[in-house]
């Protein structure tokens, strides 16, 4: 299937139908991971021409994704990241954790967006935000595609840092997602403080079941990676 670059079609539609001037694209990464936070990026891009090759982060090679992320950090008008920790995910469930991370990201932006374009079918953000959901928005919408790349690369960096003290789990390679190395380490060593104990696979490990919800999230264990704050509107 030939590459079709994302466009500003959704942004233009929102401007025309709602009067919104400042529109943020929002995407998440880490939803299906066994370990680490779920991360949401909110990116404001305006209507400028995007960097060449911008698309859903999952469709890019690691090399190209990393190069593009560097370019995006200075190309976007502004962006910010929000995280929900494994402990928060265990306590409230994924939908509420996604909302928490998204609210944190949007609240870190230098201005409040008039509208939000959310990747996917379901609106996990809700009122009071004006939300337009777009299936495969990370492929079709420029602002969401930018958020996708920024979120993915920066969460991957975060997981690599967390993996320094947990080398057997392969966080630098699997970013906390299921993998044979990750599975073997869990079965041998049990979960780290960065694991989601409510996830079905971890919950089913009988030798570690006594640890379920009996751990505290270590303050500052998730490295701070700030979003760029800009006012170039």
From Swiss-Prot:
Entry's transmembrane regions: none
GO cellular component: cytoplasm; ribonuclease H2 complex
Cofactor detail note: Manganese or magnesium. Binds 1 divalent metal ion per monomer in the absence of substrate. May bind a second metal ion after substrate binding.
Enzyme nomenclature, EC number: 3.1.26.4
Family from the record: Belongs to the RNase HII family.
Function as written in the Swiss-Prot or TrEMBL entry: Endonuclease that specifically degrades the RNA of RNA-DNA hybrids.
Annotated protein name in UniProt: Ribonuclease HII
UniProt organism field: Streptomyces coelicolor (strain ATCC BAA-471 / A3(2) / M145)
């Amino acid at each position: 299937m030939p590459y079709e670059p994302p466009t500003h079609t959704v942004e233009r539609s929102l401007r025309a139908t709602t009067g919104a001037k400042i529109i943020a694209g929002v995407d998440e990464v880490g939803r299906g991971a066994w370990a680490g936070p779920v991360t949401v990026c909110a990116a404001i891009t305006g209507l400028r021409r995007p960097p060449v090759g911008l698309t859903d982060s999952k469709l890019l090679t690691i090399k190209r994704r990393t190069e593009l992320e560097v370019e995006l950090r200075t190309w976007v008008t502004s962006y910010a990241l929000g995280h929900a920790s494994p402990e928060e995910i265990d306590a409230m469930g994924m939908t509420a954790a996604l909302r928490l991370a998204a609210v944190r990201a949007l609240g870190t932006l230098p201005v409040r967006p008039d509208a939000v374009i959310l990747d996917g079918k379901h609106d996990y953000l809700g009122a009071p935000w004006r939300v337009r959901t777009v299936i495969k928005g990370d492929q079709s919408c420029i602002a969401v595609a930018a958020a996708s790349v920024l979120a993915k690369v920066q969460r991957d960096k975060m997981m690599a840092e967390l993996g320094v003290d947990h080398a057997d789990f392969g966080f630098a390679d699997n970013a906390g997602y299921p993998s044979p190395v990750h599975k073997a380490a869990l079965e041998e060593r049990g979960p780290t403080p960065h694991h989601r104990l409510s996830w079905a696979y971890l919950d089913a490990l009988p030798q570690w079941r006594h640890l379920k919800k009996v751990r505290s999230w270590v303050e500052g264990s998730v490295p701070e990676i700030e979003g760029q704050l800009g006012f170039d509107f």
